[in-house]
């Protein structure tokens, strides 16, 4: 499977820097990496999607076309920008914003009906990991049971919560074992990404694992040259 790289800016990128970053990436991305790169700015960091060489996506959207949902971004907003790729289930939204499994299912089903490409994030906390691999498998299985694993526009991103933003990536052995388990559950055509303290120093080794189809990168993607270094390993 062709390997891909995704950048999640979270809420860390200044608005106009985000705009300049997108335009520079479009100009400088090498042909061998066309269509293998995805970028998820915050909503104000988005631009109307006229980019030809990479995919522009949204970090979040409310599962309605439009309406009285103060502060929310809806499918109509994204469609107006010609954006049809969306992150769902990121641990920061699960934990900080209390997005429940039932709400994540509602989001998934709604944007599936719109034929969006959905990047669905899963991952366990350290307390689960410390209970052993059986507990990890049960936890991840539960996170996936409410969505359609045969949806052809699905990408799954495994991000162990204890590795996100901690500068401590999961070990290569942990990634190998966990991705091997997830590959048994997922449709064979569904890309499976790793995320969690990915950077330019460890990306190449992680991409060397056969069951890793790409990377979801947070803070290491905020500087374009860092992100381009990671892209070069694809």
From Swiss-Prot:
Residues involved in substrate binding: 8-10, 165, 197
Subcellular location: Cytoplasm
InterPro entries with a match to the protein in the record: Aldolase_TIM, TIM_sf, TrioseP_Isoase_bac/euk, Triosephosphate_isomerase, Triosephosphate_isomerase_AS
Top EC class of this enzyme: isomerase
Presence of the UniProt keyword Cytoplasm in the record: yes
Coiled coil: none
An example Gene Ontology CC term for this record: cytosol
GO biological process entries: gluconeogenesis; glyceraldehyde-3-phosphate biosynthetic process; glycerol catabolic process; glycolytic process
PANTHER family: TRIOSEPHOSPHATE ISOMERASE
Name of the protein this chain belongs to: Triosephosphate isomerase
């Amino acid at each position: 499977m062709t390997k891909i790289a995704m950048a999640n800016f979270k809420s860390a990128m200044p608005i106009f820097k985000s705009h300049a970053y997108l335009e520079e990436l479009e100009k400088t991305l090498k042909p061998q990496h066309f269509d293998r790169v995805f970028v998820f700015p915050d909503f104000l960091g988005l631009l109307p999607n006229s980019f030809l060489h990479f995919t522009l996506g949204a970090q979040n959207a409310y599962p309605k076309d439009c309406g009285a949902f103060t502060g929310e971004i809806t499918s109509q907003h994204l469609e107006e920008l010609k954006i049809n790729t969306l992150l769902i289930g990121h641990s920061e939204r699960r934990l900080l914003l209390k997005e429940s499994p039932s709400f994540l299912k509602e989001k998934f089903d709604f944007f599936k009906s719109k034929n969006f490409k959905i990047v669905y994030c899963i991952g366990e906390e350290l307390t689960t990991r410390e209970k052993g691999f059986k507990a990890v498998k049960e936890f991840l299985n539960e996170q996936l049971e409410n969505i359609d694993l045969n949806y052809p526009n699905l990408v799954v991103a495994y991000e162990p919560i204890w590795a996100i933003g901690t500068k401590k990536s999961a070990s290569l052995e942990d990634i190998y074992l966990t991705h091997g388990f997830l590959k048994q559950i997922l449709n064979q055509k569904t890309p499976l990404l790793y995320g969690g303290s990915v950077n330019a120093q460890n990306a190449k080794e992680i991409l060397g694992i056969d069951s890793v189809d790409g990377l979801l990168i947070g803070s290491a993607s905020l500087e374009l040259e860092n992100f381009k270094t990671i892209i070069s390993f694809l």
